[in-house]
């Protein structure tokens, strides 16, 4: 896709939160590889683990299909999210993060991402297929806040 997609123009303030996402190098590599394989479409995954006062720890990645087959958006199936949530609870875990890619733009949340962060109030890891960068964000009090990935 050529040019700049205005859906990804950052139009809101980003501040950094003290809480972190713990994601292994192996898991980072798996997510990046998956995002690259799904190009030119956005990819997405559900990350399962545990939350404490200090961090969210990712223990399992559930790669999911982007049924929208779009270069600028993805669809979260409520049934898939429910299924993953139920399986996580059976293992004393929970959904801790949503992952998705921006194949041809920066690893920053779009206005569309911000809208859906309200519906899925988890941290969101965004991978840039353009810069190969991975950043994490959460929506708190209508402000997008950046979270460290460690």
Region locations from a protein language model:
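Conserved beta-strand-loop surface patch within small alpha/beta domains used
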Residues: 2-95, 104-150
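Short, well-ordered beta-to-alpha junction loops that form the rim of enzyme active sites
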Residues: 101
